[in-house]
Amino acid sequence: MLGSTGSIGTQTLEIVSELPDKFKVVALSAGRNIDLLTEQVSQHKPEVIAIEDENLLTDLKNNINNLGISNPPIVLGGREAINSVAAWDSADTVITGIVGCAGLIPTMSAIKAGKNIALANKETLIAAGSVVIPALKESKSRLLPADSEHSAIFQCIQGLPNYENADFSTGQIPNGLKAIHLTASGGAFRDWEVEDLKNVTVEDATSHPNWSMGRKITVDSATLMNKGLEVIEAHYLFGTSYENIEIAIHPQSIIHSMIEMEDSSVLAQLGWPDMKLPILYAMSWPERFKTNWKRFNLTEIGQLTFKKPDEVKYPCMGLAYSAGKCSGTMPAVLNAANEMAVDQFLKEKISFQEIPIFINKTCESHLNKINLNPKLEDILEVDNWARIFVQEEIKKGKKYINVG
């Protein structure tokens, strides 16, 4: 479990606790939260753990020693230690819950080691899909989505003819698939007027009406960048053209996504808005394990509604489509610029409406430098460049015309 102390990590370990006869934890990694990591070690007794912040390694080792467990785990520290955990020999599946592009290198380590990937870190494919997909083919690893929308698409696609589930991660468009319809809750501001967005606070933007998620992804949901990034991810996972991937605002978050077939038939996957279900399916596929979770009840829901996203209200959505169509290194630049802009918003250095402004400026500055056939080192280089560029532009205090 990469990112065991984050939102995806804690929910994954809850699943393991509920189904101890189905899963065993052998390796955990975290960024800085050594107290929670220590609790997880006490409960799950992995073979190895790693903390990214090496300054906390001594404290973590002391915590583990104080547990007094009979077979304590190997304790590692530093970024390279995270890669070691990702490729740990006794693991057969790696759940990637590290937020942002920081999860790219560990995910690549797991792929090269031949592990099956339950991908909750969408930035890995968005920034480096052109590198990740060939690596999956070479290693024979299988990638399954652990986020709700792409899990929904994956589940629906299994109803298509002549579709080999094991070849899911090849990025080849399945037989009979015409279009993908991604649903979006609309985020924290779906009922706000555009003119009111200038008054958005960090607290406003990190309060999601439907889902329990981390702060960064909750802000991405509010800007609809999360859905824009998922468009790019869907393109790489399922081979669908950007013109055939559509977004619909669905406030109830009951239909998690839909696929449209060549004969105009539509398949949808429904369920309560709970991240544990797609995580479990990515871990259990192709089996379905019995749970005691709340059963689905359509009459309790009452109604399902949909509407087209407002492009003025959600400029990040258009930026994501444009970056995806540019291809090459542009999606990596978009992703890095977004991560940095959201980080600066959370630190109250910029306003909510400035997030797409700085992303747009960064992408514009990269237009004449796009590498259409990047290697991994090229992806990492532009990722670093975009982060620095956003920081420098914010320091200048410049204001740009809103891309909306």
From Swiss-Prot:
UniProt: 1-deoxy-D-xylulose 5-phosphate binding residues: 122, 148-149, 185, 208, 221, 226-227, 230
Manganese in keyword set: yes
Molecular-function GO terms, alphabetical: 1-deoxy-D-xylulose-5-phosphate reductoisomerase activity; manganese ion binding; NADPH binding
Leader peptide range in chain numbering: none
Keyword Ion transport found: no
Binding site for Mn(2+): 147, 149, 230
Catalyzed reactions per annotation: 2-C-methyl-D-erythritol 4-phosphate + NADP(+) = 1-deoxy-D-xylulose 5-phosphate + NADPH + H(+)
GO biological process: isopentenyl diphosphate biosynthetic process, methylerythritol 4-phosphate pathway involved in terpenoid biosynthetic process
Task of the protein: Catalyzes the NADPH-dependent rearrangement and reduction of 1-deoxy-D-xylulose-5-phosphate (DXP) to 2-C-methyl-D-erythritol 4-phosphate (MEP).
HAMAP family on file: DXP_reductoisom
Protein name, per record: 1-deoxy-D-xylulose 5-phosphate reductoisomerase
Originating species: Prochlorococcus marinus subsp. pastoris (strain CCMP1986 / NIES-2087 / MED4)
